[in-house]
Amino acid sequence: MIDLSTMKQQIETLLNQAIERLKTKGVLKPEVTPVIKITHTTDPQHGDFATNLALTLSKAAGMSPHALAEKIVEALPPSGQITEVEIAGPGFINFFVTEGSYQTVVSSILKAGKDYGRSEMGKGQRVHMEYVSANPTGPLHVGHGRGAAYGACVANLLNAAGFEVHREYYVNDAGRQMGILALSVWVRYLQGYEASIELPKNAYQGEYIIDIAEALKAKYGKQFYHSVESIQAKIPEEIDSNADPEAYLDAWVTAQKDLLGPKDFECVFQAALDSILNDIKNDLEEFSVTYDDWFPESRLVREGLIQEGLDLLTKHGYVYEKNGAQWFRATALGDEKDRVLFRKNGLPTYFAADVAYHLHKFNQGYDQIIDIFGADHHGYIPRIRGFLKGLGKAPEKLHILLVQFAILYRGNEKVSMSTRGGTFVTLRELRHEVGNDAARFFYIMRKPDQHLDFDLELAKSQSNENPVYYIQYAHARICSVFRQLKTTQKNWDRPRGMENLSLLSTNHEKELLATLGRYPEVIKRAAMNYAPHLLAHYLQTLANQFHTYYNAERFLIEDDNLRNARLNLINAVQQIIRNGLTLLGVSAPEEM
């Protein structure tokens, strides 16, 4: 018997056979190649599956959709899994499948276990995913958390759909912000010896900077000490800290490098980078967000990748020189303005690093490359696509997914975040307050491009209104039924239950069976659309249906055949909830 999870393919095969028959009869021309779309119906009165095929082909057939639907239905070969086919509305074709097709899904789930829902849809295809990639200038904040949860879930879904996924974090260990970080740590270190030294206005000011500085002092003593006077002597008098705080900050960074020299500056720099990067790694690992590689920006320079990118763009005629700098002719490829690749001092820009990093990704031969950025990176999209064309790479291989930052609320008060100001709420603080499970689920339960108001009180509540609690509670309730079974004289005979699945005839049972059968399709859709919220919504529906069933029926009944069938059914529900939550990075507790 055909499993419900493969029923759509069976119906598609039947429709293709019907189309070929209509071509033979001259109803359709031989060159007609329809795209057959089959959907689950939302109302059982309209059957189990439906297609709009007649509506899409009516023009080619030269007849009304309803008339063509009649001919398609007449041409359908018989099937033992379909009990009825009807035409609805202007020409929709509805299919009613046998109850046995639904019941078979239980045996399929219990046989496959944790692998149920996995497919080979993406077999042989390699996907590169980059997500989070926050600058290692401070702890991850709650805004980064959404990108982390989303990226990890998309990677899990693609893996479940058969794709080979490479997860990567791009470490921005070069550039201006890292210089400011090293300066911030150094000034805090100096304050341990000379309290009169003030931290520049726009430096990083969080407590974590002080912690790094104290560790530096404990390990190296006064090795990096310089007096206030020696520093001030290095700051040009014409730079006003109030009028131009950024220029003043850059002057401090230059002074630090001059006074410390390359070796000591690198020591301070590396201490700051290692401390923060290790914290980020630990934070993400605790959040079940893992990577195959942490790719440092410095590697681009070390391995000549930036120069390789420049040479390739030059070869294709997209580089020119102006005012001593080297520019990318971005406007010729759809960008709003041309971009500097190398400054007049010979140093590469962030843009040059972006070019080199994407060139490296494309050179690895991936079938898909996925970049997950914050929504504030919207302007990067035409820029990146432009330089890919300039490099001679296929832009269609790149998928840029934008994630709106989550907005955290305490009551009705919005919490502001500022990395340099040090007033942000960290991802770790959020996780400790609401738990990993709630954080993971709340982050992905809406479309990534939708704004997310993170309700702390709801996330912590143990109520039906808390979606992750409600789903986990369904799993725990099923575990409780099987624990109760062990305290009775009754048994659970799984093979006998399989033989009596036809006894699952109540509306609640039919509803659960239909929803269970949709799971493999949900995984495929969620993977192909990079949409973990589809799985989250599915699990909410399944949990709601189970709770309704639990409140309406009893499971540990005297009737052996019905008891075993029902226990098999709820065991299948338990398995699907556990499988789905695992893909979302959420636990499935046995007790709550």
Swiss-Prot record:
Chain positions of motif 'HIGH' region: 134-144
Family matches, as Pfam families: Arg_tRNA_synt_N, DALR_1, tRNA-synt_1d
Cysteines joined through disulfide linkages: none
GO biological process, one term: arginyl-tRNA aminoacylation
A GO CC term attached to the entry: cytoplasm
Listed SMART domains: Arg_tRNA_synt_N, DALR_1
GO molecular function list: arginine-tRNA ligase activity; ATP binding
Record's catalysed reaction(s): tRNA(Arg) + L-arginine + ATP = L-arginyl-tRNA(Arg) + AMP + diphosphate
InterPro entries hit by this protein: aa-tRNA-synth_I_CS, Arg-tRNA-ligase, Arg-tRNA-synth_N, Arg-tRNA-synth_N_sf, ArgRS_core, DALR_anticod-bd, Rossmann-like_a/b/a_fold, tRNAsynth_Ia_anticodon-bd
SUPFAM superfamilies assigned to the protein according to its UniProt record, in alphabetical order: Anticodon-binding domain of a subclass of class I aminoacyl-tRNA synthetases, Arginyl-tRNA synthetase (ArgRS), N-terminal 'additional' domain, Nucleotidylyl transferase
EC numbers: 6.1.1.19
Keywords: Aminoacyl-tRNA synthetase, ATP-binding, Cytoplasm, Ligase, Nucleotide-binding, Protein biosynthesis
Cell location: Cytoplasm
Alphabetized CDD domains for the sequence: Anticodon_Ia_Arg, ArgRS_core
UniProt key word Transferase: no
PANTHER family: ARGININE--TRNA LIGASE, CYTOPLASMIC, ARGINYL-TRNA SYNTHETASE
Subunit and interaction comment: Monomer.
UniProt similarity note: Belongs to the class-I aminoacyl-tRNA synthetase family.
Protein's name in the database: Arginine--tRNA ligase
Organism: Coxiella burnetii (strain CbuK_Q154)
Gene name for this UniProt entry: argS
